[in-house]
């Protein structure tokens, strides 16, 4: 299969903002793709060569890409950089220079060759790796047409930006290989328990939908985490959960999924990054506490060894370094609070109700000084729920997660729902909780902020449309060093136009690819004529905006943009807020 077909698809995707047209373009390509290549096409179309949990990245800088381009075109790197400044994008610059120079490809690029070469680049490490990576990529460019060059450059520098998410790809796979969108749910279940969309696509293309239904949980493949909805009124929480709930402490730490098979451990973050090397001490503690073959979830916190008190979340962030040393282990001692189990000795437990899973935990976890079960209480009245909430706050927690005890209280991998409800009340405002919002744009600063942004345009996520919808412009709560930090984080994700997945009425001075999640608080949610979250849902020609938004100082690197607060959550928060006021 020629790579030019992928490049042509990418151009179509880039030029449309219609999800229907994007889906159809993907359907057409998937139907043309040989089954043995479908996984590679899926990976390449999301800008990767393997699922995120493998940690396989290109580690290929823009500077290296320019050097490769310079070699092929026989022009100076300075001339290329000048063209990049003019076009605002390395891919566009490369395409234009190829066309101007009349470069003739030295061969025909295939999907197989592109994938194989990019994978080799990602796997090349150690002494001399920079030179070898450069040689490999240069050979690809020699065989590329101008359009192919554009997308190869964007791919290798991890800036493909096609505006498609997992949901759009799953819709297209369902239509292409089963003839209808309704089978997407089966594909999504397989993806949620394997976290590998390319793998699911290949099983579907080669063996059909029944084989996808038979995809099982495996040690080493992370399960996409179950997510909680949020409510602020205890009586409503209990009513929503059937009058009775299992209330658990919501620890202010890092959610970690632990896989164990014998002495082999895998630790995955909330966004499915492999963080095994960052917690060698936690693994030693877990060896004493958890079964030989299992998948469990826990909240890791930093504690004060003398008192056992939980230290602030910021202390835990000091453990998120590439190389953990004895210093980190001594200064930031870890404890783990286990709150769920999804797999035990070959058995998938995700379809068992929560009370059964909790009982299995209690029977199989050995409590030690550093490993414990999450603090829990069964509550069936508001007074007990309120009392337990205050106890959690006093013990240094964020609040509670209230869990359904009903028969349908399965572990909903990759889904957000009311089987789990967060209760994190903020007494200083009407806002029931902080919001985790995605940076999608910025507005220029003035005075002391000249040269930096004045405010950031923040958005929630709508999984139904696979779009990011604006909620507020935030310009307060930032410390002096935040401006430099955010500038460094955002500059490589700058766009010269609004991202196709961003739904915004406002015109930002700078647009960004949605990737960075920040924790935002505020006074209350109000009807807004300029923000698109909840547009027409509460009132015609009005959305929902956050009044007096403020950055809490917390960067949510543990969350993907698709893990941000959803539109539906914000609508529910607004309704709860109205009820509290009344």
Curated annotation (Swiss-Prot):
It catalyses: ATP + (deoxyribonucleotide)n-3'-hydroxyl + 5'-phospho-(deoxyribonucleotide)m = (deoxyribonucleotide)n+m + AMP + diphosphate. GO terms for molecular function: ATP binding; DNA binding; DNA ligase (ATP) activity; metal ion binding. Belongs to the ATP-dependent DNA ligase family. It is an enzyme of class 6 (ligase). Keywords: ATP-binding, Cell cycle, Cell division, DNA damage, DNA recombination, DNA repair, DNA replication, Ligase, Magnesium, Metal-binding, Nucleotide-binding. It comes from Persephonella marina (strain DSM 14350 / EX-H1). It holds the Pfam family DNA_ligase_A_M. ATP binds at residues 248, 255, 270, 299, 339, 416, 422. It comes from the Bacteria. This is Probable DNA ligase. The keyword Cell division applies. CDD domains: Adenylation_DNA_ligase_Arch_LigB, OBF_DNA_ligase_I. Signal peptide: none annotated. Its EC number is 6.5.1.1. DNA ligase that seals nicks in double-stranded DNA during DNA replication, DNA recombination and DNA repair. GO terms for biological process: cell division; DNA biosynthetic process; DNA recombination; DNA repair; lagging strand elongation. InterPro entries: ATP-dep_DNA_ligase, DNA_ligae_ATP-dep_bac/arc, DNA_ligase_ATP-dep, DNA_ligase_ATP-dep_C, DNA_ligase_ATP-dep_cent, DNA_ligase_ATP-dep_CS, DNA_ligase_ATP-dep_N, DNA_ligase_N_sf. Its cofactor is Mg(2+). The active site is at 250 (n6-amp-lysine intermediate).
